[in-house]
Swiss-Prot record:
Its main location: secreted. One of its GO terms (biological process) is proteolysis. GO terms for molecular function: serine-type peptidase activity; toxin activity. This is Vipera russelli proteinase RVV-V homolog 4.
């Protein structure tokens, strides 16, 4: 899931 900083940053902090 690509959202940015309001997606799953805690699980996959790549699109922060």
């Amino acid at each position: 899931v690509v959202g940015g900083d309001e997606c799953n940053i805690n699980e996959h902090p790549f699109l922060v």
